[in-house]
Amino acid sequence: MGFMGQPSGTWLGLINAVYSLGALVSTIFAAWCSNSFGRKLCVWLGIAFVLAGSILGAAAPNDTVFIVSRAVIGVSSGMVSNAPPLLLNEIAYPAHRSISSCLFMIGYYFGAVISSWVTFATRTYASSWSWRLPTLLQMLCPLVAIPGFLLTPESPRWLIGQNRVEEARKVLADLHASGDLTAPLVTQEIHEIQEAISAEKESAASSSYSDMIKTPGNRHRLLITVTLGIFSQWSGNGVVSYYLAMVLDTVGVTATKDQLLISGCLQIWNLIFGTIGAVLVERAGRRPLFLTSAGVMLVSYIIITGLSGSFASTGSAPTGTAVIPFIFIYFAGYDIAL
């Protein structure tokens, strides 16, 4: 296994944490980059970082290089979490924007299905390729996406913001009106974008960041905006996903094959329920999905905790096994509001 060994304790925590640190740093830069130089450039940078990080990680001769590769992958994550959803919403047909943005989020699970089953297949490798190959294959989906992205136009909203109105008109006409540059929908969209940009510029000239805390309404909205991202990661999904093997260890599922099999099946399950949530977003509404998600996660997490505690006290195999279906139920709740 080389320097990797069996990650645990601080070493395991560092492998996971440095990824988030890289994402945190690049998220701030990504917003500026996508607004200043276009959504596509930011996406290209994200692709470049994930390719570099994958190669660096797979070829890492020691733990220091591997940790750096994880940070590089994290930088990529911050970029591709910022610009692509913007670009997708700005080129999608108006009636399809909600479901398009939701389907973008479940792309994570599409990649997770591949990675989990590749890891399952390489579990028997006696060499360091048992983890180097899955690390290298992080570049698979970005490579597959490159040909399609070469054909993807720049955001019409960004183009209009750069006074490249005719280029934006052609993009909207090609995507929304079968190439008709004079279509009423195209004219209306351009007008709406111009008005929105103008309003934003006027607002920026007469306001400051301090305005976000000056009124009760603004403070309430700021609180929701800030805490939504925090609580989405504090809902327990990180513990169950990043440390699934350790969770399973605590309930008596200790065989590597069984743990990886559960992980692979869980990612397929996540992909299915993430898709269901995306399809239901317009029919059921966002708030009902959020509330349903929170309720399902709360109840199932309480049950998981109770069963885990009972297993620790009694060592009852059926009690430990009962945790597994509730992990799946928990993630079904998480997925529908993703």
Where are these regions (language model features)?
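Cytosol/matrix-facing amphipathic helices and coiled-coil assembly/linker segments
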Residues: 186-202
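Short intracellular "coupling" helices and adjacent cytoplasmic loop segments at the cytosolic face
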Residues: 175-188
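Alpha-helical transmembrane bundle of multi-pass membrane proteins
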Residues: 1-174, 198-338
